[in-house]
Regions:
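Domain-scale activation on soluble regions of proteins
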Residues: 1-191
Length: 191
């Protein structure tokens, strides 16, 4: 009887189409942020495409979806901050920590320095979304764990509208991705 091989999750497949590649260029913040946004949207679109067939999954997967979206915002903010620092003549420093409110404050300051007062209505909605998310998950733990550090349940009853969440992810994601792309181009066009 042959011994079973150990389960190995991180080995390449012999068929290239079943492999994902992480390379030196994946160290740029945009790559990570884009992946978290895409994962958020794929899960939401799955539920919206088949609301009857995914009823039980919606409740069990909404927390990972919210975590993915929150983490997208965190990574995109950090990405914009680095570009904004360079464009403002500051040294580029990648921020650590998960405080969306302080990251958002810095994004606003740097966007005002780069663009002046010409911010879109969507940009204002980002701040409203950050406020909502931070009320539910101020430290990036509430969407990941069932209980807080005192052992108390984090959510007793919360209803999340998936259509509204999907529209928010798309709208805010487009706004932030556009800012990141514009700043990236400006940084790369500098002499």
């Amino acid at each position: 009887m042959a011994t079973p091989s150990p389960l190995r999750a991180l080995v390449p497949d012999h068929e290239i189409r079943f492999n994902a590649v992480l390379d030196h260029w994946t160290g740029v913040g945009d790559f990570h942020a884009a992946g978290y946004r895409q994962a958020t949207e794929l899960l939401l679109q799955r539920f919206l495409a088949d609301p009857e067939g995914t009823a039980g999954e919606r409740d069990s997967l909404v927390l990972p979806i919210l975590f993915l979206f929150r983490h997208y915002l965190e990574l995109r903010f950090k990405d914009i901050i680095v570009y904004g620092q360079v464009l403002s003549g500051q040294p580029a420093r990648w921020r650590h920590g998960h405080d969306l409110e302080s990251l958002w404050t810095e994004v606003q300051e740097l966007c005002n320095a780069v663009y002046g007062s010409s911010v879109s209505a969507e940009f204002v909605k980002v701040g409203e979304c950050v406020t909502d998310l931070c009320q539910l998950d101020p430290n990036s733990t509430s969407f990941r764990y069932p209980r807080d550090t005192n052992g108390c349940p984090i959510f007793e009853h919360l209803v999340i509208g998936l259509k509204a969440l999907n529209a928010t992810v798309a709208s805010i994601g487009d706004c932030l991705d556009d800012i990141s792309m514009d700043m990236s181009v400006r940084v790369h066009d500098q002499p």
